[in-house]
Design a protein with these regions (language model features):
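Active-site neighborhoods and metal-handling regions in enzymes and metal-associated proteins
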Residues: 1-213
Length: 213
């Protein structure tokens, strides 16, 4: 590739990651305020999306992955928030695909007893603003099966350990990188025997720019 070609000609290639972070990833006070408001609204839309599913199932109205995705898109548009691409709505096995996206032609119906993942994000218009981005799962029924509850408990423990490590580092004046927090989460997951099912990194950075990733 290009990197190998340049190196073959003699120059030493170094990463520009630190330069990019200082120049492009600094948040202004306005960006922080807009991000917090976007997070609040994204959480509200998440609640509305699960209520949309609950209401549809309770009233025997057809509900699908694509239908929920479209509901989320319309709700963000109504609020004047931007998305860079549609939300992820995955049912059962599709919830295990980190980059799954339903379409009008390929969409699974949501039924009683299904496991539903919703990953959604939005921001106030403008690349100077930062996306709010969250992922939630829910069970379409009155009682979550023990097997799924057990896995959720493990994931929640991993999440809490990461937050605890962040707080500890903050109070201690310690700098952390993303891979170190990913390792904290992986250690918990692997410790419970689910290491091979950990198919995606733990989260991603957020900052100003054209995309949520």
């Amino acid at each position: 590739g290009t990197l190998e070609l340049v190196r073959s000609l003699g120059p030493e290639v170094v990463s520009s990651a630190d330069l990019c972070q200082v120049a492009l990833a600094v948040w202004s006070a306005d960006a922080l305020a807009a991000h917090r408001d976007a997070c609040r609204q994204v959480a509200e839309v998440k609640d509305a999306a699960f209520e949309y599913i609950r209401y549809g199932l309770a009233n025997h109205t057809a509900v699908s992955e694509f239908g929920v995705q479209e509901f989320i898109r319309a709700e963000f548009a109504r609020r004047g928030l931007d998305m860079d691409h549609p939300a992820i709505v995955g049912v059962n096995q599709n919830s295990g695909n980190p980059h799954y996206s339903p379409s009008e032609k390929e969409s699974v119906p949501i039924q009683q007893g299904d496991w539903v993942l919703i990953d959604l994000w939005a921001r106030h218009p403008g690349e100077q603003h930062v996306f709010g981005d969250i992922t939630w799962v829910g069970f379409a029924g009155s009682r979550v099966p023990e097997s799924q509850a057990a896995v959720f408990t493990v994931v929640r423990e991993a999440r809490d350990r990461v937050v605890e490590r962040l707080v500890e580092a903050w109070h201690g004046g310690e700098e952390l990188q993303g891979w170190q927090l990913d390792r904290v989460a992986r250690d918990v997951i692997e410790g419970h025997g689910y290491g091979e099912q950990y198919v995606h990194r733990t989260g991603h950075s957020l900052g100003p720019g054209p995309s949520v990733h």
